[in-house]
Amino acid sequence: MKQNETFDQEREDLYHTFDEEDEESQTESSVPSTPLSRNRSEDVPVPWPRSYRQSMDLLTGVTPPTSTSFVSSFRQRRQSSVFGSFTSSPSKQQLLIDKDEIQSSVVSSIKSFLASHLQLSVPGDLLTPQENRSCTFSQSVLNGINVLCGVALLTMPYAVKEGGWLGLFILFSFGIITFYTGILLKRCLENSPGIHTYPDIGQAAFGTTGRILVSILLYVELYASCVEYIIMMSDNLSRMFPNTSLYINGFSLDSTQVFAITTTLIVLPTVWLKDLSLLSYLSAGGVISSILLALCLFWAGSVDGVGFHISGQALDITNIPVAIGIYGFGFGSHSVFPNIYSSMKEPSKFPTVLLISFAFCTLFYIAVAVCGFTMFGDAIQSQFTLNMPPHFTSSKIAVWTAVVTPMTKYALTITPVMLSLEELIPSSSRKMRSKGVSMLFRTILVLSTLVVALTVPFFATVAALIGSFIAMLIALIFPCLCYISIMKGRLTNFQIGICILIVIIGIVSGCCGTYSAIARLIGEMT
């Protein structure tokens, strides 16, 4: 009973810290306001989602938590921001407020009081709220590569089969375009000290509606990624143990279904954990996993004797939209770039971080795509690990790497979704906010990803759908639209023209890819 009360108190602190900050910010009314601050709405509720930045920090590994509890860490971070933060600014105008004047005035008042009444001299840096900028340049590069080079690597050779060799130029072009849109997000972040995350950018550009729309898309992408993890783990395990089956009360389950259920039961306890720091550190090793997978593929082709053979079409017009979706899936990590930027000790080096990360991942994708397709040709499957001969040691290492890696990432990926949904529970309902209800809610959410994975167990097609619909919006369309809106009146015609061109490319690619992916999905299910 005491444990539940403690849990309830932590959750109340987690979701009400923002309300306390709102009250504190209202006490600063004596400070002269800027033109934008005069438009502030005092009665607008705190915008959803409030837990985005902290939960995404865990996912990216940019600032692995050192406290014993994620909730405690989150609460401490929020309470340190006594001058207000982005989450207490629900409207577009509030996010664009220049808080330097307010902060400077309040700090000066505190210093004056301490000096005149208590004869104390306080260093300025102790009174100024500090952002958690702890990542070095090299750590930021690793974080960038880690979030970019994910499970999409496995399906790059399959994309060559679908789109042909010339489709690699599309992959390269997406690398350049998404690098540029990442720079646009950085410029949006620099526009105001109150902007820290992608939802903040959406809010600054289009108000609360923009924040909610961007957040929903980001959470749908995370949820879909968890579905892909289950499909990926079950496919690779069924490749290793193809004769596995299960019969229960007349129901027959093949190896893929058995392992989908098994892996879900394995990852389920990890979503109940309050301390995800260990998983965060393990997930940060995703770069090593990706390199290991590529080395195993090359080893199987060059040393184990699979060989390399040039084949395939130059361009497959019919299936190129599916390839476009897969390529887009490989570059849809813009949701976490603002977190990486906000965590850097030297934010001015963020463009270089993006350049190195995108250059490495683009060339890495191309190398794996060429290597995998020349090894297996038109027989290539949705994941190249499924084509590797199971009796080779390199194949076993690759398969187990493809199984273990998503196990470490599942809880970190689904946690932002769970926290955002738990925010919607009324604060007055203590029963709904109990530990038992929270565990039940999380269990249902995890089981729902299993149901989706069993319904559409097609890794490449689901990847193409995510890349075409969500990644095009997040990585191409929204960065340009938000940039134009936030920087209104300060852009040249050339800059606006480039943004409009990218938006058109994103819309055309997204529509064609989404239609083709849905059509193929229907065909595979029937």
UniProtKB/Swiss-Prot annotation:
Give residue spans, biased composition: Basic and acidic residues. 8-18
The reply to whether DNA damage figures as a keyword in the UniProt entry is no
Query: What's a GO biological-process term for it?
Result: amino acid transport
Q: Where is this region: Disordered?
A: 1-49
How is the protein disposed in the membrane?
Answer: Multi-pass membrane protein
> Which Gene Ontology CC terms are recorded?
organelle membrane
Q: Which UniProt keywords apply?
A: Amino-acid transport, Membrane, Transmembrane, Transmembrane helix, Transport
Family designation: Belongs to the amino acid/polyamine transporter 2 family. Amino acid/auxin permease (AAAP) (TC 2.A.18.5) subfamily.
Q: What is this protein called?
A: Amino acid transporter AVT1E
- Origin species, per record, is Arabidopsis thaliana (Mouse-ear cress)
Gene assigned in the entry = AVT1E
